[in-house]
Amino acid sequence: YSYGQAVNRILDSGKLKREDIWITSKCWNDSHERSQVMSACKRSLENLGLEYLDLYLVHWPMGYSNDPESGLKISDVDYLETWKGMEDVFRAGLAKSIGVSNFNIDQLERLHANCNIKPAVNQFEVHPYLSNCELVDYCKSQSVHVTAYTPIGKGGSSNLSKDPVLVQLSYKYNKTWAQIALRYNIQRGISVVPKTSNKDRLVENISIFDFELTGPEMDAIRDIDREQRMVTFDATKNHPFYPFEEPKD
């Protein structure tokens, strides 16, 4: 996500120590061979100017290569091989923990049955219009921590900002609809990573620990689930390891 220079600046300034911040990076889809994973991690560390990551994730279960002529070219590398490379990274001390992103239940079960080190985290899309309850519950049952990306939706692709339930709760608690959406997942025991570089938004996003939604309010938000996925990566839909099902009618 090209934040290496920002990380370098803040650490070089002395305002924060390395141990004061949590830094996650991901192994991209064109580095899924076991021998490539270590090199990809080292490149990330070099770009960030770091000696280790707090968390390193397999970005997607499906691998591919970028063909200059034909574009995306599906790779037949199994994510089980990729995970062996992730275990190598962990053993080498380049990442304090390793995990996955966008893995479904079947893929996690297969990974658990064939790994030496279980993933610590599964990062996937979770927001009030996609509560992903089944996957969240499965991860919790396996002691896999859930991190939610797009926890307040994505750009103009959702109507979360106008949802009556979120708007009503925002008035009650004197918060924004986005803060209500973030608080919803926090109370589910889910970490959230809203994407912004705006300072005011950063402050707003962290200002969600001075109130608590009631049980009925949590249920009301859960009930607005539309199974509305906003990140689909359509270019890889034909890959055998594509993790998402077609939306229900």
Go through the PLM ranges and name each one.
Residues 1-21, 38, 152-155, 247-249:
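N-terminal binding-site loop/beta-alpha segment at the start of enzyme catalytic domains
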Residues 3-6, 36-45, 82-85, 165-166:
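Short, well-ordered amphipathic alpha-helical segments that serve as non-catalytic structural scaffolds
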Residues 4-18, 45-50, 112-115, 136-142:
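Acidic (Asp/Glu)-rich catalytic clusters
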Residues 17-31, 55-61, 123-126:
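A short, structured active-site edge motif that brings together acidic residues
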Residues 26-35, 71-75:
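Active-site mouth loops of central-metabolism enzymes
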Residues 33-48, 106-108, 130-131:
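Short, acidic/polar
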Residues 37-58, 88-92:
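CE4/NodB-like, metal-dependent polysaccharide N-deacetylase domain
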Residues 60-249:
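Beta/alpha (TIM)-barrel catalytic core signal, keyed to glycine-rich beta->alpha loops juxtaposed to Asp/Glu
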